[in-house]
Amino acid sequence: MDKLQYESIYGYCRVSSDEQAKHGTSLAEQKKTITKMSMYLFEREPDGFYVDDGVSGALDFYKRPDGKKLQNILEPNDVVLVAKLDRLIRRLSVLCSVRDAFNELNIHLFAHDILGGAESISTSKSPNVNMFVNMMGTFAEWDRKADT
């Protein structure tokens, strides 16, 4: 497989509660998954990590402390990696706004739990990938509401 070539590569991690950090997908586990994905896809480690600890995934991405910092440094052809889509978003409307903004700026978003991170979900032209990503976003929103 040819390794993909992009500019800067960033990992984004999020947990919303201490309980989730202990018994869910911890920040350390997310960083480990993202690093492995980066090494596999790009043969290099991420250039940095942005971490929102104790922040709800329902909050608009750009209103989160590190979400905003990440937004401010991203440039065309950069990459954002997440371990799981629900670590990025927990509301379908947030997913749609992030995906559309990233697509418009040619920023590539990869999620390990979507096709093993093998295809950019923000710039994909595949109707099947787009449908699957929307379904995963819907499930993430449903799961957030069902847990409350």
Task: Walk through the language-model features, giving the residues of each.
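Short, structured surface patches at the beginning of a domain
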Residues: 1-148
